[in-house]
Amino acid sequence: MTRILWKMIKDDLLLPYIDLKTEYYDLGLEHRNETDDQVTIDAAMATKKYGVAVKCATITPNAARMTEYDLKEMWKSPNGTIRAILDGTVFRAPIVVKGIEPCVKNWKKPITIARHAYGDVYKNTEMKVPGPGKVELVYTAEDGTQTKELVFDFKGPGVAQGMHNLDNSIESFARSCFNYALDTKQDLWFATKDTISKKYDHTFKDIFQEIFDADYKEKFEEAGITY
């Protein structure tokens, strides 16, 4: 369906008015399976090269899709793969035009949601715990020394998940958010569960604050917006 819609958009709205030169990458599930998902990586690298892309909706397979499409494996989300390569930020901005009325009538200004697009659940490692036993986080330094943290001492079957992120990616995320707020003249609100996640989420909070204080505080004051 997305192929049909994109073709209609190009044929009716774009090609009659502009000389559109594009590279096309088929991210349909069957073709991703045929190429061992290499086509998704190729599409991401092309996006990085040209600085712009239009991506249509894709299927991220679950167990039922594995059987339906006879897949080699349960391929990861194309969005997650592309975002990780681009180290990008997802901005969900509302459509604000006459004729489209907001659900909350007294909201006159747009609310944009910014989400970090690297790591977290998109690059996680999961396992099903078959029975009693310990799940641990282990960090092995280059010199071979190890640091261990107990995740949970299971008394029966369950599930476990490990996630990661990078300081430089969080810094890039912070700058994207601050620059977007300045460009659109929107106040920026930061939300995380740092009171519970005192290392993972708190690192996001600390990095945002450090960058804001060092590089953006005066710019925000001049623009009349707040963080």
Q: Residues of each region from the PLM?
A:
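Alpha-helix initiation/capping motif
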Residues: 28, 35-37, 166, 222
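Generic structural hydrophobic/aromatic packing signal, biased to beta-strands
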Residues: 22, 54, 82, 111-114, ...
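Glycine-rich phosphate/diphosphate-binding loop of Rossmann-like nucleotide-binding domains
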Residues: 1-8, 12-15, 137-227
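Short, ordered loop/turn segments at secondary-structure junctions
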Residues: 27, 58-59, 193-195
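N-terminal glycine-rich phosphate/adenylate-binding segment common to multiple enzyme folds
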Residues: 31-142, 146
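Generic detector of short, locally flexible boundary/turn motifs and exposed helical patches
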Residues: 19-21, 75-80, 153-157
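N-terminal alpha-helical transmembrane segments of multi-pass membrane transport
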Residues: 1, 6, 10-35, 44-47
